[in-house]
Amino acid sequence: MSSFKSQCEIIIDKPAHVVYDFVTTVSNWIGIHPACKGIEGDDGLDKEATVGLRFTETIDVRGWVFQCHWEVRKMVKDQYFEFSLPTDFILPPVYNTIITYIFDPIGDNKTRFIRTMINCTNADATPEQKADFADTDMHTDYLNAVKARLEMS
């Protein structure tokens, strides 16, 4: 077993509750996250997600289109959000992915938004296979798009 972590952060000129509400509404990811091409699943995709929500995200990474079946695992309102692949989902070489969002208030009207993705892979995964899951430019583009969307309102 092997794992690797991608982490990025950005300062957004909005309070933590605004950033939290936006990014935990998974239907907002379409058109904001560069790899997200669609979201399907349980009722509640168009409002703040709650623990136990399951949904399927269609992802396109450089022409490789696949679906991930996510489940919201943990949350602390306006502070922390975590979702991961259920244990019955396997997408070689990755057998588990955990994504966390941390919302760190800076004063009254700014938030440090930190996104971390941990991928657990088979020991024999090649560097090329891992690269598709560790594209930090894509993660940074997502945070920049969240910032742009929230700060224009």
Swiss-Prot record:
Superkingdom as given in the UniProt entry: Eukaryota
UniProt xrefs under CDD domains: SRPBCC
Pathway participation: Secondary metabolite biosynthesis
Known function: Part of the gene cluster that mediates the biosynthesis of the indole diterpenes penitrems. The geranylgeranyl diphosphate (GGPP) synthase ptmG catalyzes the first step in penitrem biosynthesis via conversion of farnesyl pyrophosphate and isopentyl pyrophosphate into geranylgeranyl pyrophosphate (GGPP). Condensation of indole-3-glycerol phosphate with GGPP by the prenyl transferase ptmC then forms 3-geranylgeranylindole (3-GGI). Epoxidation by the FAD-dependent monooxygenase ptmM leads to a epoxidized-GGI that is substrate of the terpene cyclase ptmB for cyclization to yield paspaline.
Protein name: Penitrem biosynthesis cluster 1 protein I
Organism, as annotated: Penicillium ochrochloron
Lineage of producing organism: Eukaryota, Fungi, Dikarya, Ascomycota, Pezizomycotina
Gene: ptmI
